[in-house]
From Swiss-Prot:
GO terms for biological process: protein quality control for misfolded or incompletely synthesized proteins; rescue of stalled ribosome. It comes from the Bacteria. This is Peptidyl-tRNA hydrolase. The record marks 91 as: Stabilizes the basic form of H active site to accept a proton. It holds the Pfam family Pept_tRNA_hydro.
Length: 189
């Protein structure tokens, strides 16, 4: 069994935010695989299904981003899983908008949701699917990081991100089917 956790903030007011790209990707993946988020469990909205005979659980924590680890640790206990069984889908400021990268382990890189998960599950050794949202443009009236991640994608940027979310959904399927090395070689950009 694999647990795929998409990171984001709950609530309609956050749904289009850059910081919610993990939720957006998981919604796309669920739609592509006919999975609905029809349960509430472990501080999360969850759905389950199968990909190539592998049972999967999708989870969108309903804590705020900075408390995502509470949901992740409850989910691991509920399903009796190890960190090696989870995949976390996250936004990444350090990647240009629309780029994706699969990676096992590593630091939180300043991402408070990832930091919370590392703290609460006690390890950084889990797979992350990072979706680039780019850094704020320093020429753009000094936009702060918080304003950037909680801002919505604009016109051209939205088109780039829609394609990235589709590609990230495909990367999840490849990861579940062929493993991390093959998926990384195919999708890391």
């Amino acid at each position: 069994m694999k647990l795929i956790i998409g990171l984001g903030n709950p609530g309609k007011e956050y749904s289009g935010n850059r910081h919610n790209v993990g939720f957006q990707c998981l919604s796309r993946f669920a739609k592509d695989n006919h999975i609905s988020f029809d349960k509430k469990c472990c501080l999360s909205r969850t759905g389950s299904g199968r990909i190539n005979d592998e049972e999967i659980v999708l989870a969108k924590p309903q804590t705020y981003m900075n408390l995502s680890g509470k949901a992740a640790s409850q989910l691991l206990r509920r399903y009796n899983l190890k960190a090696a069984d989870i995949i976390v889908v996250q936004d990444d400021l350090d990647l240009p908008a629309g780029k994706i990268r699969l990676r096992l382990g590593g630091s939180a890189g300043g991402h408070n949701g990832i930091s919370s998960i590392i703290t609460d599950i006690g390890t950084k050794e889990f797979i992350r699917l990072k979706i680039g949202i780019g850094k704020p443009d320093s020429r753009n009236n000094g936009t702060e990081v918080v304003d950037h991640v909680l801002g919505n994608f604009g016109g051209e940027e939205r088109e780039i991100m829609d394609k990235a979310i589709t590609r990230a959904s495909e990367a999840l399927t490849c990861l579940l089917t062929f493993g991390l090395d093959t998926a990384s070689n195919r999708f890391n950009s």
